[in-house]
Each structure stands twice: as structure tokens, then as C-alpha cells.
Amino acid sequence: AKEKRLKGSVFATMENVLAGYADPGVGAASSTSEIDVTEWLTGNNTIFVVATAHEQARLRPVLTVLIQQAIRAAYDAANERGGTLEQPCLVLLDEAGNIAPLRDLPGYASTARSHGITLVSIWQDLAQIKAIYGDRAQTVLNNHRAKLFGSGIADDPTLEEVSRLMGDEQRTDVNKSGDLHGPRRSISEHTSWRRLAPVDAIRRLRTGEGILLY
């Protein structure tokens, strides 16, 4: 019984992974390749990888493999030239958690820049990153040099993280008591730290506004 359940689990996983390749359009497109990776990396060229919202889950394995191959080709080309691409390469992953969640993204985030590859990934919130990468989620965030947070964030941990990254400011309060113009006056100072951008202020960002940390 245990062996049957294991086989069933393996077959179910394989079925999900290969479902995209069963698509006639995918099969026809993958039988030949018109993409010359060398030409793509040496010229002013762009590869667009797009899927409609209702097709993303089914085509995710196919698109993930395609993007992974393109990134690895860029790394290989950089290594052949001593570590850096002759012409900079931009990898822009919009809806990174939906269309093609790359297993090796934490590693790419930490090494791409040194190879002449600019990596941009766009997420809905931190919860989405953690759901995919678990303990490695913070690595994904930390290794993106620039971080742009837009308005409309509803996830409390994301709001708190933005507030923390903004840092604190020192504030000194002066209290005066007694006869302010006589000998019995008392003046005291109290120094405290507070967030530059409290969570409630970030939550109130208007459409078109954002916070860029670099």
C-alpha cells in the first residue's frame, strides 16, 4: 500500500510537471529552436516570456525551464570572458512568484550583479516570497541592492519590514516645569528613537507613490 501511494505521488508530480509539454503549441515550439542565445547576449535583443493568468499554472514548468536556461547561458558567457558579460544583461521577472518561480533565485540574487547581470524581481509581498523560498526568503530580499515598495501593501509583516529597513531617527524632547522665568524652573531632556516611517504612514501611501531603498 505504501509503495502504491509513493508511485501515485510520483506520477501526480510528473503529470503536473509535464502537463505544459502536452500542449500542442508547446510541443510544436519545442521541437525546434529559433532562439540563438549567443546572438541574444551579444546584441540589443530581448526575449519575452509571457503567459496569461489562467495559463500560468499549467505552463509554469515550461517557462521556468526556458528562463533558467537563458540565465545559465548568460552565466556561462560571462565565465568565458573572465566573469563579466561584454554587454550587460537585464533579467526582469514580473509576477516572479506566479509565472516562473526560479528555484535558484536566492543564488542568482547574490551573484548576478558580479557577472554583469541585472536581476529585477517583482512580488506582491514578503508572504509570497516566504511561501516559495522559506528560510531563504530573506536572502532573496537582502541581495537585491535596490528595493522599491509601492502603495497598497496589506501584508503586515511586509509593512513592518519596510519600516525597519527605513531605519530610526533620534528625537530629543525638552520638558520645562516650575517658574519658567525664575530660579525654580526645571528643564529636563529625554532622548528616544523612533521609526523614520511608521507602519501606518507606509500603509497610507497613495497610488503612484512608493519608497525606494538603495
Cite the ranges covered by each PLM segment:
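P-loop NTPase motor domains
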Residues: A1-I117, I132, S192, D200-Y214
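P-loop NTPase motor core of the ASCE superfamily
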Residues: N44, P106-S110, Q128-Y214
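Active-site-proximal beta-strand/loop segments in catalytic clefts of secreted hydrolases
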Residues: A51-T52, Q124-D125, S151-I153
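Acidic, glycine-rich active-site loops and adjacent beta-strand->loop/helix elements
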Residues: G97, D125-A127
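Structural recognition of the conserved hydrophobic beta-strand(s) that form the central parallel beta-sheet
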Residues: T118-W123
